[in-house]
Structure formats: structure tokens, C-alpha cells
């Protein structure tokens, strides 16, 4: 109640950008400028795991990024920064999402790599 929320249409208004066309760094920069400090992202995708079913909610705890054609950092050009990705997700926010999903009796799988 009384919380401000920012919404960003990842694929643009009208869903017009392919994933490879999305300017992720601009999106993150814009959210940061708005004062956003936590992000909840929704995605629909398939899985090779037979124990995941359509409609299941999965709360990731790690990322495997196999993309190669887009910039991976805000740094460079003489600026070297080392940022740990050992725990890329906020544990307290993940726990809130898990509790919310389970309260609806929806199948929820916590701690799954994405």
C-alpha cells in the first residue's frame, strides 16, 4: 500500500523489439535514474527440465548468460570495476516472491538457475 512502482516494457510499447534489439543498459540506467533499487522481472520461456510445467513459477538464484553480441558492462574505456556475480539475486526479495507464489497455491520452484 502506498508503494511507488516503475514499469518498463522490455520489448517496447507494442512489443516491437526482438530480445537482441533491447537496449538493456539503457533500461537499467533509466530505472536507476528513477530511484529503483529492486527489480522483479517476468519471463515466459521453455525448459528442458521435465519437472517444470507450463504455468509454474520459478524463482532463479543464479544466471548463466550465453549471449555474446551485446555489451555486458557499463564500464570500460579505462574504467576497470570488479563486481561479484556470486549472488546476483536479492535473497529477501526472492523470499517475498516465493511466499507470495506459495500463498496462491501456485507451483513455485525456488533456487533454480536461470
What does each model-identified segment do?
Residues 1-85:
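Metabolite-binding pocket within alpha/beta catalytic cores that recognizes anionic/polar moieties
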Amino acid at each position: 500500500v502506498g508503494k511507488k512502482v516503475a514499469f518498463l516494457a522490455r520489448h517496447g510499447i507494442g512489443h516491437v523489439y526482438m530480445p537482441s534489439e533491447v537496449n538493456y543498459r539503457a533500461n537499467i540506467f533509466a530505472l536507476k535514474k528513477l530511484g529503483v533499487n529492486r527489480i522483479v522481472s517476468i519471463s515466459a520461456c521453455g525448459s528442458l527440465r521435465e519437472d517444470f510445467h507450463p504455468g509454474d513459477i520459478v524463482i532463479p538464484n543464479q544466471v548463466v548468460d550465453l549471449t555474446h553480441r551485446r555489451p555486458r558492462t557499463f564500464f570500460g574505456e579505462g574504467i576497470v570495476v570488479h563486481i561479484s556475480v556470486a549472488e546476483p539475486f536479492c535473497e529477501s526479495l526472492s523470499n517475498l516472491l516465493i511466499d507470495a507464489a506459495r500463498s496462491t497455491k501456485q507451483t513455485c520452484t525456488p533456487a533454480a538457475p536461470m
